[in-house]
């Protein structure tokens, strides 16, 4: 007793420490052990006294006292009676807090089924009984009897009997001949009598005997479930409940409102229902009521328990008085408002405030302006403590008064308290980690927070009314972390791409750009200045201008740190910037030798950061910001309407395009082109015209004239703003002074008539109407985009949250090949950029000399990356998170550089979350649009290739035919044109499409810009490889082709139609055969005949009986036919790739290398076989819908991994056929393409990290001697561990293939059930976990946040390591002491005392 009193004022003891959490089914005994008493009455509180009713839902005897240390009747009050149970009212005298943790229970008069295990699919109860869910429900809800024990009767076990059948059976066989039951009792009896081990053995036997795939799957699922029950220690009958727990009353409170009414939690209503029905059932059973009444009551009890656990899962939703569905226990956990996401993963915190932000250009980068009023409120406890320490107040109450009166000494104290105490600023939405940064507060008057202009980019903040929140880190550790990790000065680089994110924008850029302009013939040209002061004097007295070319003295340091001076040619403006550069050997004045656009400034800051370090960069950024603002203000740049110059060439360009368009119209009328082709060509012509007008306008605006005095005129202000990157873009200027161009309909199609006017001229009514159409869609899209982007980020974070750097080096030699990204001869991303900051997996050799540039396992920094690029290396093998062999997490060597720091990554860095944020954050900038034919108004179809460099032409896999004009026509689908230089090195290679007309021959010399080949971008031709007579096969008018007469032109053309609809036409296959003069089909070199199958939509270019020459086109397939598949762009495309969905018309990929053969058709599918060259492999067959355009002909040799059918490939196919590296490359290229289009740079590493998380499962192929089942999906780590165990025991190991899961699926299948439950489908995840008796080892971030521990990343990772080390040391010391005791034979009392001493030490620590 005395001991307790001593401890009363001490803080509560720390909670139990644990390192795993297990979830399982609760047995009735377990529920009783939790409970403090049975709830027998549905009453809550007495309406007059407001005291809880005895034995009711709020009973104080069961759940504990309402007031601290006071029993209900008031006999015992005060702490001295602690622990006594009042003999009058039965309440234990203790803290009222126990009402939050004590549970009760309800004894059910009849068992009921737990709805989660009954209705959560797949139904566990139905599966273990091997019955249909419908049948189980029939039994449970008292519609049918079930035979439990058939005895000697011909009835089957588990057979259902209706009421009549049951009566008849009883009459026929006698009442005791068999047992049948109804309701949950019957099901429970079956489950109790079930012998799981025997049942498992039986299912195993069945699996061996069955031949059907379906049955195998069914057996496997059932076997898995029964094994789960056996291994987890759960009993199947626990899925039927005989007693239900009642949660503590404080968690379902009853709150009095004014006016004598009460607000109550829905759970109380649901519990009341259960108790009422249960009591009524008890009474009916005692009264021996008729069976039918009891049965009805039992069914109602089952329904009320169902509603309590999961309202609305079965039957009608139970609603409250206001027709609103009641929130059941499941709803408490589910969704955004549920326990997981509302209270465990995100909490509201104390010591925080929010206010509007304003710009603070006079702040240093690490400061923010904090309003005094806010600071006073936020730092209250610190102020109280300091006032006390200084002796200005004696008690907390006095301090409070001082602060409330805002006495002068309080402000002095506040200044002291705030000094060097960082605060965190956050702007919602926090899309990446730079959305929260720490600053040192600077007290300001006013009520708005001041923010440094350079951090706006990271916060994505602007000052049009944005608000930000302030948080105060309280503990010393928190302050330390805020200062070292989160300070704005420590976050100069963006974690997404490693480029500086503290980059000037807008006014600053404009000021710096203006400073760096250089002009001819300015006053004072050629003067030389010795010092900064001379220069300023000359500027002040207008002897020179900012743009005059002058000579000046520059002082710097060389490599050894010695001072050097030299004379440089520069302008006064540029000299100011040069003077700001940090003193360093690499910082040369030539760095500021051209116009400073936003990009150039970014690159400059990057250089400063790389060479001079963080501190110098921060100072440099602050200085150029000040300079930029000052000079922009002094320059006084502004613009008026007249600065927008409309180019004179516009009229001619528009006129020329109008002529072209009328040409196309005429061709269409004459029947030379189809409607679709005309549309494509018109859109194309206008798109080109718009671009030409825009270029003419830019030329016009960027021109500067020379005046009579030889001075260059001022640069056009609008051009300056756009060119410097301060504001506006070429696209916006095009709309202001060029022509607005083509507009899109909301569906994404492009309207043929463009908007020829610009905003300066004004739009006509029709043009305005056309433009509103797409503009409105744009606004609607933006709203949807934000939500979609947020959801993508959430899924990404969830799948990657447990990916943490856990060790230095996993020691793998694996890696995957990295090359430069080349698009149409242009290098989009160089090899240098792609390998920077990675670790090489293999040595890199100089392709020319063959000497080793660097060995394997070298970390690639800027210098090495450049050296590799300069040596002309084509590709390197680098390590990647994808190939890392660390069990849990990733190793630092495979990951490489931490992009936000520019150094090797630290252990404990949460790279998964960083990857998710880097990919999700730019999501709002991506478009939502799904482009229809024609793409955007920007994209013109490419219809030719030009040589990008000089060299010699060679062909790979050539297959050509020379047409009547003497041009080569490409006939192979995998033919490549390669240009090699004099040393025989590949300079560029182009894949040639089927039917490309080549302008060069093998061995020709090329010059840069020469046309190499061309094709019609709007149709795919079918080319005859031989000359002869055309014979039509299966081309029947009205069945497989129809003559389409164009209404506009009256010209008829024959088009292949979908013939598969009619029954008799099913076997048709429209084909064009080329015959010789004897009427025999001509044989090709490959051995097949010259016959060409036609796809739906093909337009015939020849008639039956025509003569054709080699290279002639016999039919053409309009490519919108092949391209109507929408080009899913932007966000939906990224989501589609990460979710690993199969695209609608996905490509068919060849699984082996071999020759293509067409087999017998099957229904309306065409059978295609690939026959391998050797004998060892089997041939592979595919069924492809007829009428689809195939990319290969019969007899073609096709390589493994090539497409038989065009389209987007399904990622699963790539993984299965070509393996992980090919899949990774495909996903990286596709995802990066979307981001590159929007100009968002993201490092490949992030995408690789997410893909790694998508490949965490393995599908078992051969289980070996493991307990796995064939085709079962197993966790990769688990699989490796099982195999290691099998190998150690000398057993046969399991084999399997990696499986690709979409991010949602992967999140739901993580090893941690807590993480999965907090993501989506909470009930399903928890049901599954409970049946399996899963353990959560708390490895990821989410589960640790939920249970309230330090996350195992960053400082938390280190703390965890120390903990493990400390535990081991303790164990060793104890062992040593015991050994010593045994050796010396000390008396046991001393040993016990020593042990107690140890325990006390442990407790104290």
Swiss-Prot record:
What does this protein do, in the record's words?
DNA-dependent RNA polymerase catalyzes the transcription of DNA into RNA using the four ribonucleoside triphosphates as substrates.
GO CC terms of this entry = DNA-directed RNA polymerase complex
| Gene Ontology molecular function terms on file | DNA binding; DNA-directed RNA polymerase activity; magnesium ion binding; zinc ion binding
Q: What is this protein called?
A: DNA-directed RNA polymerase subunit beta'
Query: What is the organism field in this record?
Result: Maricaulis maris (strain MCS10) (Caulobacter maris)
State how it assembles. Answer: The RNAP catalytic core consists of 2 alpha, 1 beta, 1 beta' and 1 omega subunit. When a sigma factor is associated with the core the holoenzyme is formed, which can initiate transcription.
Out of the domains of life, which is the source?
Answer: Bacteria
- GO BP annotation list: DNA-templated transcription
Enzyme Commission identifier(s): 2.7.7.6
As cofactor, the record names: Mg(2+); Zn(2+)
InterPro entries cross-referenced by the UniProt entry: DNA-dir_RpoC_beta_prime, DNA-dir_RpoC_beta_prime_bact, RNA_pol_asu, RNA_pol_N, RNA_pol_Rpb1_1, RNA_pol_Rpb1_3, RNA_pol_Rpb1_3_sf, RNA_pol_Rpb1_4
PANTHER family in alphabetical order:
DNA-DIRECTED RNA POLYMERASE (PTHR19376), DNA-DIRECTED RNA POLYMERASE SUBUNIT BETA (PTHR19376:SF54)
């Amino acid at each position: 007793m005395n001991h307790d009193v001593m401890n009363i004022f001490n803080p509560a003891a720390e909670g139990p420490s644990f390192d795993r959490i297990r979830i399982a089914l609760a047995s009735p005994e377990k529920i009783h052990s939790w409970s403090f008493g049975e709830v027998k009455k549905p009453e809550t509180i007495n309406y007059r006294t407001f005291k809880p009713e005895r034995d009711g839902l709020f009973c104080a005897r069961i759940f504990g006292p309402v007031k601290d240390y006071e029993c209900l009747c008031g006999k015992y009050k005060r702490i001295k009676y602690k622990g006594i149970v009042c003999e009058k009212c039965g309440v234990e005298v203790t803290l009222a807090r126990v009402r939050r943790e004590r549970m009760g229970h309800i004894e059910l008069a009849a068992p009921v089924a737990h709805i989660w295990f009954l209705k959560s699919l797949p139904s566990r109860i139905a599966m273990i009984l091997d019955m249909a869910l419908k049948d189980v429900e029939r039994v449970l809800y008292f519609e049918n009897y079930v035979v439990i024990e058939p005895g000697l009767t011909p009835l089957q076990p588990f057979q259902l009997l209706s009421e009549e059948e049951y009566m008849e059976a009883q009459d026929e066989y006698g009442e005791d001949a068999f047992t049948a039951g109804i309701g949950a009792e019957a099901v429970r009896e079956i489950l109790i009598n079930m012998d799981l081990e025997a049942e498992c053995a039986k299912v195993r036997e069945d699996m061996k005997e069955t031949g059907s795939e379906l049955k195998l799957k069914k057996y496997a699922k059932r076997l898995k479930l029964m094994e789960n029950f056996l291994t987890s220690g759960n009993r199947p009958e626990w899925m039927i409940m005989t007693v239900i727990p009642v949660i503590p009353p404080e968690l379902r409170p009853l709150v009095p409102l004014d006016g004598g009414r009460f607000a109550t939690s829905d759970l109380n209503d649901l519990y009341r229902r259960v108790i009422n029905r249960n009591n009524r059932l008890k009474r009916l059973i005692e009264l021996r009521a008729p069976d039918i009444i009891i049965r009805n009551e039992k069914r109602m009890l089952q329904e009320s328990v169902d509603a309590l656990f999961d309202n609305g899962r079965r039957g009608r939703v139970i609603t409250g008085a206001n027709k609103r569905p009641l929130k059941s226990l499941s709803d408490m956990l589910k969704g955004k408002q549920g326990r997981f996401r509302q209270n465990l993963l995100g909490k509201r915190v104390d010591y925080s405030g929010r206010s509007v932000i304003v710009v603070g250009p006079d702040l240093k980068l690490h400061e923010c302006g904090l309003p005094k009023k806010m600071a006073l409120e936020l730092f209250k406890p610190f102020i109280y403590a300091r006032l006390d320490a200084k002796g200005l107040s004696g008690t907390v109450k006095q301090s409070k008064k001082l602060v409330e009166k805002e006495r002068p000494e309080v402000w002095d104290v506040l200044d002291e308290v705030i000094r060097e105490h960082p605060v965190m600023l956050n702007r919602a939405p926090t899309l990446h980690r730079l959305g929260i940064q720490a600053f040192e507060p600077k007290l300001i008057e006013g009520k708005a927070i001041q923010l440094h202009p350079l951090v706006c980019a990271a916060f994505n903040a602007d000052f049009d009314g944005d608000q930000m929140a302030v948080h105060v880190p309280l503990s010393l550790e928190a302050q330390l972390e805020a200062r070292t990790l989160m300070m704005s000065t420590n976050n100069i680089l963006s974690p997404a791409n490693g480029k500086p994110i503290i980059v000037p924008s807008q006014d600053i850029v404009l000021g710096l750009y203006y400073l760096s302009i250089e002009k001819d013939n300015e006053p004072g040209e050629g003067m030389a200045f010795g010092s900064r002061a001379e220069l300023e004097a000359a500027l002040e007295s207008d002897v020179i201008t900012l743009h005059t070319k002058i000579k000046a003295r520059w002082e710097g340091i060389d490599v050894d740190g010695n001072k050097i001076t030299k004379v440089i040619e520069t302008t006064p403006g540029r000299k100011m910037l040069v003077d700001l550069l940090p003193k360093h050997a690499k910082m040369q004045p030539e760095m500021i030798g051209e116009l400073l656009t936003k990009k150039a400034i970014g690159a400059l800051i990057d250089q400063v950061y790389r060479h001079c370090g963080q501190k110098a960069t921060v100072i440099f950024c602050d200085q150029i910001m000040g300079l930029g603002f000052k000079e922009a203000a002094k320059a006084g740049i502004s613009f008026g309407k007249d600065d927008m110059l409309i180019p004179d060439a516009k009229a001619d360009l528009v006129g020329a395009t109008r002529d072209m368009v009328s040409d196309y119209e005429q061709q269409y009328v004459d029947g030379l082109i189809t409607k679709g082709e005309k549309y494509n060509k018109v859109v194309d012509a206008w798109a080109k015209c718009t671009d030409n007008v825009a270029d003419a306008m830019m030329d016009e605006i960027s021109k500067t004239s020379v005046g009579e005095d030889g001075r260059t005129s001022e640069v056009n202000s609008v051009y300056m703003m756009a060119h410097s990157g301060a504001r506006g873009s070429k696209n916006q200027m095009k709309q202001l002074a060029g022509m607005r161009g083509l507009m899109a309909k909301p569906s994404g199609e492009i309207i043929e008539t463009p908007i020829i006017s610009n905003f300066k001229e004004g739009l006509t009514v029709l043009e305005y109407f056309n433009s509103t159409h797409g503009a409105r869609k744009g606004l609607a899209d933006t709203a949807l985009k934000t939500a979609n982007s947020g959801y993508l980020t959430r899924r990404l974070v969830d799948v990657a949250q447990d990916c943490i750097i856990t060790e230095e080096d996993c020691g793998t030699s694996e890696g995957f090949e990295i090359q430069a990204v080349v698009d149409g001869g242009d290098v989009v991303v160089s090899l240098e950029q792609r390998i920077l900051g990675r670790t090489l997996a293999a040595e890199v050799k100089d392709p020319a000399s063959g000497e080793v540039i660097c060995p394997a396992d070298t970390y690639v920094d800027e210098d090495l990356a450049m050296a590799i690029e300069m040596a002309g290396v084509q590709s390197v093998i680098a390590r990647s998170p994808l190939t890392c062999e660390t069990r849990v997490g990733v190793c630092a060597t495979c990951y490489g550089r931490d992009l936000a720091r520019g150094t090797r990554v630290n252990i404990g860095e949460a790279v998964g979350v960083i990857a998710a944020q880097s990919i999700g954050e730019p999501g709002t900038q991506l478009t939502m649009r799904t482009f229809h034919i024609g793409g955007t108004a920007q994209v013109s179809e490419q219809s030719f290739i030009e040589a990008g460099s000089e060299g010699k032409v060679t062909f790979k896999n050539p297959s050509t035919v020379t047409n009547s004009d003497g041009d080569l026509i490409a006939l192979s689908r995998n033919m490549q044109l390669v240009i090699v230089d004099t040393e025989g090195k590949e300079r560029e290679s182009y894949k040639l499409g089927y039917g490309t007309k080549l302008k060069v021959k093998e061995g020709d010399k090329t010059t840069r810009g020469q046309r190499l080949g061309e094709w019609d971008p709007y149709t795919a031709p079918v080319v005859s490889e031989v000359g002869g007579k055309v014979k039509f096969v299966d081309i029947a008018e009205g069945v497989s082709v129809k003559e389409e007469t164009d209404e506009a032109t009256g010209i008829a053309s024959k088009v292949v139609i979908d013939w598969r609809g009619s029954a008799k036409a099913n076997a048709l296959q429209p084909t064009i055969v080329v015959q010789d003069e004897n009427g025999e089909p001509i044989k090709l070199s490959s051995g097949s005949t010259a016959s060409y199958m036609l796809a739906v939509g093909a337009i015939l270019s020849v008639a039956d009986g025509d003569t054709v020459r080699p290279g002639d086109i016999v039919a053409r397939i309009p490519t919108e036919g092949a391209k109507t598949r929408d080009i899913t762009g932007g966000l939906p495309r990224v989501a589609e790739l990460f979710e690993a969905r199969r695209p609608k018309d996905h490509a068919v990929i060849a699984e082996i290398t071999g020759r293509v053969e067409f087999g017998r058709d099957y229904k309306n599918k065409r059978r295609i076989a690939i026959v391998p060259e050797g004998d060892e492999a089997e041939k592979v067959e595919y069924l492809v819908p007829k009428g689809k355009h195939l990319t290969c002909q019969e007899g073609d040799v096709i390589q493994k991994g090539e497409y038989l059918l065009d389209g987007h490939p399904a990622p699963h196919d790539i993984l299965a056929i070509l393996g992980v590296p090919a899949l990774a490359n495909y996903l990286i290229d596709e995802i990066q393409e979307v981001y590159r289009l929007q100009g968002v740079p993201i490092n490949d590493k992030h995408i690789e990290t997410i893909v790694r998380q998508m490949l965490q499962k393995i599908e078992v192929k051969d289980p070996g001697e493991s307990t796995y089942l064939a085709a079962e999906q197993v966790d990769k780590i688990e699989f490796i561990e099982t195999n290691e165990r099998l190998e150690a025991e000398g057993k046969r190991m399991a084999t399997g293939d990696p499986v690709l899961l979409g991010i949602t699926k992967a999140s739901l299948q993580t090893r941690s059930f807590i993480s999965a439950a907090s993501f989506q489908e909470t009930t399903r995840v928890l049901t599954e976990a409970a049946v399996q008796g899963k353990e959560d080892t708390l490895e990821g971030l989410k589960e640790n946040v939920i249970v309230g521990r330090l996350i195992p990343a960053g400082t938390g990772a280190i703390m965890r390591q120390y903990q493990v080390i400390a535990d081991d040391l303790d164990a060793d010391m104890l062992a040593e002491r015991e050994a010593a005791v045994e050796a010396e034979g000390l008396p046991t009392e001393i040993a016990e005392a020593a042990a107690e001493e140890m325990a006390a030490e442990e407790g104290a620590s």
